[in-house]
Amino acid sequence: MPDHIYSHSFAQFLRNADNSVVNINPYPYVAFEDVFDDTFLRECLKELKSYLTAHFKETDLFKVFQTTDLANLEDCIRDAHTNVPNLIRLREHLYSPGFRGFVSTVTGTGPLDGAVDCSCNIYTSGCHLLCHDDVIGTRKISYIIYLSDPDCDWLAVDGGQLELYASDRRTVPTHTPVVSILPSWNSMVMFEVSPGRSFHAVREVSAEMKTRVSISGWFHTKERHIKRNQRETSTLDQLHSMIPATHAEWAVLHVNRVLSPSYSLVQDLTKWINPEYLRSESVKRVRQVFEADGSVQLFNFLLPHIAEPIKRKLNREDCRNSRHRCMYDHGYGDSWVVQGPPHVQRYLSYQPLECTLANKRSNSGELLKKLMCDLFESSSFQNWVRAVTGSVCDLAHSEVRRFRPGFDYTLAHAGTKRCSSEIDVTLCLTSGPNPAEWLSGDLGGFKCFIPIGSKSDRADVYEEIGEEQNMRSVTPSFNCLSLVKVNTGIGDFVKYVSTSAKSSRWDIVCRYST
């Protein structure tokens, strides 16, 4: 195998390679440093910056800039062999029989196919890739070559680490990663793609002046007789059979079938709700909007003397936790329980076993729990929902949630697809020092409702969300109640909350089956 593109030390290793360098925990992977000749790799980076166009892509799973597949360099770049000769050489060496044989030897896998499957991924500040296992089609080995700035060391505080997750006996990833690898210049990571094992993520890049650049791709197995169900199993499809995401139990609510709020109903709600939303004219107007659009947002929903103490309490909680924001377990405790698994979701749910007087006085979760129980789970509120939506509500799932910056999200997948119509009622209590920052969407934390498609084993199974998909998005805003009609076949997600957010997304969510 030609070795003139490699560093001297790596070229020597290539000639005597074995699998002794493989780490086995949490699953087989190998990490190399000083892989390529420094001058050669700098030329690759220069060509990449000069001739390749990176397109912004964002879904529930990731936020990244990505170039075209490097297999298509000759089709995308005029005079490619003249303008990007080093990128072409790199691609040809990576998928040459010699290097594929080296990968097979080091990883202990069987023969690998020569099909080129790689691209350049660019992570600027705020970009991320959430937990998944890469299982699509015939992928066998995943690899990443890092081309971040060669003249500026990458530090842990910059984010962008490749994170590897362990799995339990049910092939479900643990809540937090066990291995973290910095995207250092001229390093390379490889790991075997394995269903229910090779869970990994790219932590959000938090450095404003650094860019995480990598060439990543897959080596595919040569075996053409893989069982059909194994070959077509993607991370998205596996969510049908995985251990379900954790959440609170559903509760039966006994709803009086009234067409509009009665006097006693209104009296019960005047202690909590802005009186504007209790007037008969307003109820009719809200219902008209809801029936026409399928959703409505009601701002300043709670009375000021209810909302303001909540805001102060939640802001203090975010400030109190700010010193530990880099730690995955920050915010745990006081009956706040992490909900997972992380290839489906990660957020904190308030689930008290019992409430002591101390908890009532000091715990922000208990404050929200009381609001949920006294207002949202009351028959008066349920009948108000009936009046403003025109829907009879029979079942409800209610929950107090916290989505922490830099950690938390939910993903859209088959498990969130509704089998029957529902009314999603969410009181968002997100504030922070500058609430307007949430409006752009750059901080994440918004809630989306989208159609959930059928199974697929395509490499782009996590498709970009386009306007043609009739996506409905609700931006986080303090003291805002949103009501959304969720039809059969629709799923939802809460977009990952960026580390740049100054506060968590706090909410109380209720789902009514209609």
Curated annotation (Swiss-Prot):
Per UniProt, which keywords does this protein have? Dioxygenase, Iron, Metal-binding, Oxidoreductase, Vitamin C
Residues annotated as binding Fe cation: 132, 134, 200
Q: What class of enzyme is it?
A: oxidoreductase
Domain of life (superkingdom): Eukaryota
Name any cofactors this protein relies on.
Fe(2+); L-ascorbate
Residue sites binding 2-oxoglutarate per the record = 146, 212
The cofactor note from the UniProt entry for this protein is: Binds 1 Fe(2+) ion per subunit.
Under Gene Ontology molecular function, one entry of this record is:
L-ascorbic acid binding
Which positions fall inside the Fe2OG dioxygenase domain? 114-221
Enumerate the Gene3D superfamilies for this protein.
Answer: Oxoglutarate/iron-dependent oxygenase, C-terminal degradation domain, q2cbj1_9rhob like domain
BP GO terms, sorted = peptidyl-proline di-hydroxylation
Give the reaction(s) catalysed: [ribosomal protein uS12]-L-proline + 2-oxoglutarate + O2 = [ribosomal protein uS12]-(3S)-3-hydroxy-L-proline + succinate + CO2; [ribosomal protein uS12]-(3S)-3-hydroxy-L-proline + 2-oxoglutarate + O2 = [ribosomal protein uS12]-(3S)-3,4-dihydroxy-L-proline + succinate + CO2
- E.C. number, please? 1.14.11.-
Q: Keyword Amino-acid biosynthesis on this protein?
A: no
Q: Which InterPro entries match?
A: Oxoglu/Fe-dep_dioxygenase_dom (IPR005123), Oxoglutarate/Fe-dep_Oase_C (IPR019601), Pro_4_hyd_alph (IPR006620), TPA1/Ofd1_C (IPR043044), TPA1/OFD1_N (IPR039558), uS12_prolyl_hydroxylase (IPR051842)
What the protein does?
Prolyl 3,4-dihydroxylase that catalyzes 3,4-dihydroxylation of 'Pro-61' of small ribosomal subunit uS12 (RPS23), thereby regulating protein translation termination efficiency.
Describe, as the record does, how this protein assembles with itself and its partners: Monomer and homodimer.
Q: Identify its protein family.
A: Belongs to the TPA1 family.
Q: What is this protein called?
A: Prolyl 3,4-dihydroxylase OGFOD1
The record lists the lineage as: Eukaryota, Viridiplantae, Chlorophyta, Mamiellophyceae, Mamiellales
Name of the coding gene: Ogd
